[in-house]
């Protein structure tokens, strides 16, 4: 199982909802680690401010992508209960992680 260190900061999301979003992100990143088998440690920072979300990551000490992944808060909220939205979010994070590791898209 991958070691995931997620730091999250929310400005407009209530605390309970923020914790649910944080857990959903951790679960998604763990799934990607198991599926891709390309990293064992992930340091991830997620920020939400005025409903704008950004995610940055360092995977096994590698961070070749300096631009944060912009995520849609509505998509993230839908991903908690909707498998289609969850799959879309997971794919966005998967592609971002490949850029972080320096892989071509």
Question: Which positions does each model-derived feature cover?
Answer:
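C-terminal low-complexity, charged extensions that often adopt amphipathic alpha-helices
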Residues: 87-105
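Short, structured protein-protein interaction patches enriched in aromatics and acidic/basic residues
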Residues: 43-58
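Intrinsically disordered, low-complexity regulatory segments enriched in Ser/Thr/Pro
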Residues: 2-13, 54-91
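Negatively charged, low-complexity tracts enriched in Asp/Glu with abundant Ser/Thr
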Residues: 1-44, 82-84
């Amino acid at each position: 199982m991958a070691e995931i260190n997620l730091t999250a900061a929310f400005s407009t999301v209530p605390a309970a909802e923020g914790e649910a979003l944080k857990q959903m992100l951790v679960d998604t990143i763990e799934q990607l680690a198991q599926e891709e088998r390309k990293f064992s440690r992930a340091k991830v920072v997620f920020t939400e401010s005025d409903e704008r979300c950004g995610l940055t990551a360092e995977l096994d000490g590698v961070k070749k992508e300096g631009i944060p992944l912009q995520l849609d808060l509505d998509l993230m909220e839908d991903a908690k209960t909707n498998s289609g939205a969850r799959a879309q979010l997971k794919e966005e994070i998967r592609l971002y992680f490949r850029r972080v590791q320096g892989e071509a898209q």
